[in-house]
Structures are given as C-alpha cells and as structure tokens.
Amino acid sequence: MKKLHIIITGKVQRVGFRYWLHQIANEKNVYGWVKNKNTNEVEALLLGKDKNVDELIKLIRKGPSSARVGNLSIQNYQKEYLRKSFDILHD
C-alpha cells in the first residue's frame, strides 16, 4: 500500500483539475482527497496499491488537456487514513 501527499503547481485551478483527478482516481481504485490551495496549487492525498498510485502519478504529471502541470512535490504520508473513497474537499 502506497500513501502519498502531493502538491501540484502550474495552471491547475479553474481548469477542472480536481474533478478530473476525482474521476481517474476512482478508475484506478485510489483513495484519498484533492483540494485547491490558496496559493493557486492543488493538494492531494493518494492511497492505494503501489501500481495504481504510480500509474495515477504518471497521469497527474500530464494533467487534463485544459491544465498545465508545472511541478509535483511528492512526500510519503505517514498517518492513518481510513476512508475508502476519493473526495473533492472544499474550503
């Protein structure tokens, strides 16, 4: 099981990035959440089988056609996360 906390920079807000990520995370059976940050970045938590999370990261690096992904900051997530869904969080 892989657990990653990521920050995505670039043109990733107001382009449907969170909804796109929600859809592909569900297709890949990856759990966690995604939300916009006040810094025009997108933050996400990804949990799932190593292969599924790795495939999702590759897709995130490309992003949807409306986005321009600049950089991905990836850190291992150490805390426990019990939800078995992928959610879009709103502030």
PLM regions and their residue ranges:
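Intrinsically disordered, low-complexity, mixed-charge
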Residues: 1-91
